[in-house]
């Protein structure tokens, strides 16, 4: 079994094959030039301890998402520091999204990282809004991780296996 990432074309519901690779300085420049919600050139995101990855369509190499992950070996998990869809797939920036499933693919890759590190597949993240918190809980099985911060969520166990499993294929 091997991860085979994809996103969904909103108009046709077709699964479009996508790849995840290390993000580059050119990717970060595009976030400013193409008016992404966040400028990925900031010191916060450019923290050397963050692993930054880009999600792009296999056929066109169109950049559709970026994510920054923090390896947390003492906690035996990975923290999803930040992730974002390109404007064409970001519901905050586009009334009609060209693509869906970008966040799911980036979260699944986040689960792949601790598996690759030998930890299992636990990730945690902080939802930016109540709406996103409910979305992560409803669609990805996230559970509250802290009684002090209801926006801090954990995706582990069956929920992590189910989400990552969506992208596994025999090759």
What are these regions (language model features)?
Residues 1-97, 105, 112-124, 128-131, ...:
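Non-catalytic substrate-recognition and accessory regions of acyl/acetyltransferase enzymes
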């Amino acid at each position: 079994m091997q991860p085979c990432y994809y996103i969904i074309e909103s108009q046709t519901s077709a699964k479009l094959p996508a790849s995840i690779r290390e993000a580059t300085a050119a990717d970060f420049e595009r976030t400013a030039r193409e008016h992404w919600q966040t400028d990925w050139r900031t010191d916060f995101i450019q923290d050397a301890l963050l692993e930054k990855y880009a999600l792009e369509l296999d056929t066109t190499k169109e950049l559709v998402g970026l994510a920054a992950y923090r390896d947390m070996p003492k906690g035996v998990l990975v923290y999803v520091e930040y992730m974002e869809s390109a404007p064409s797939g970001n519901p905050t920036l586009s009334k009609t999204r060209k693509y869906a499933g970008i966040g799911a693919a980036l979260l699944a890759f986040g689960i792949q990282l601790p598996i690759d590190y030998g930890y299992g597949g636990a990730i945690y993240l902080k939802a930016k809004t109540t709406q996103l918190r409910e979305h992560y809980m409803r669609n990805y099985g996230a559970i509250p991780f802290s009684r002090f911060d209801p926006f801090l969520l954990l995706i582990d166990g069956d929920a992590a296996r189910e989400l990552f499993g969506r992208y596994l294929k025999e090759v």
